[in-house]
Design a protein with these regions (language model features):
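Short glycine-rich loop/turn motifs
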Residues: 33-35, 44, 131
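A structural signal for short, well-ordered beta-strand segments
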Residues: 36, 87, 114-116
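Active-site-adjacent beta-strand/loop module that shapes the phosphate/pyrophosphate-binding cleft
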Residues: 91-123
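Charge-rich, low-complexity intrinsically disordered segments
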Residues: 155-164
Length: 164
């Protein structure tokens, strides 16, 4: 049975979002960013960045693979070294209208989504990291502190947890 995921729409960026569950990293769509779902038992790693609590997320740098990006961003934001990361799919972003929020991105792009449960936690030194705090939050309580946890992300997290 194929799992279906809710769709989303980013109002400011005028962009439709849908999650494509796959283990294949396609070269047919440009990946511009990544998201990491890093689990420790029944808890998910969150990082406190200027917009609020979030999962480790970041943009791909020139010449970098998305696997390199997700490891780098996780380390930069949390001080956690992700070892064996697993690609579980991507958020497919389709611009409805080009505007100031989305003009630096292609009309069709992707955000790679990864999971990890093999990692090393180092000391968290705020000046060395992009975030001000990090925590492992019970997966049933993410919405209590996450700055924006829509149904699409809840369903992706549940799907990711089932893949461990």
């Amino acid at each position: 049975m194929t799992q279906t995921f809710p769709k989303d729409f980013w109002e400011q960026a005028q962009t439709n979002i849908e999650f494509i569950a796959t283990s294949y990293i396609s070269g047919d769509i440009p990946f511009t960013a990544v998201k990491m779902l890093l689990f420790d038992d029944h808890k998910l790693l969150l990082t406190k960045v200027p917009r609020g609590w979030d999962i480790p997320t970041g943009h791909k740098e020139e010449g970098e693979s998305i696997v390199e990006t997700v490891k780098r961003e996780t380390l930069e934001e949390t001080g956690v070294t992700a070892k064996n990361v697993i690609f579980i799919g991507y958020l497919k972003l389709t611009q409805v209208v080009q505007n100031e929020q989305n003009k630096k991105y292609p009309p069709l792009s992707a955000i790679g989504v990864f999971i990890c449960r093999d990692f090393t936690v180092s000391d968290f030194n705020k000046p060395l990291h992009e975030a001000t705090e990090r925590c492992f939050q019970e997966i049933d309580r993410i919405g209590e502190i996450h700055h924006y946890w829509p149904p699409i992300m809840e369903s992706i997290m549940r799907y990711a947890y089932s893949k461990l």
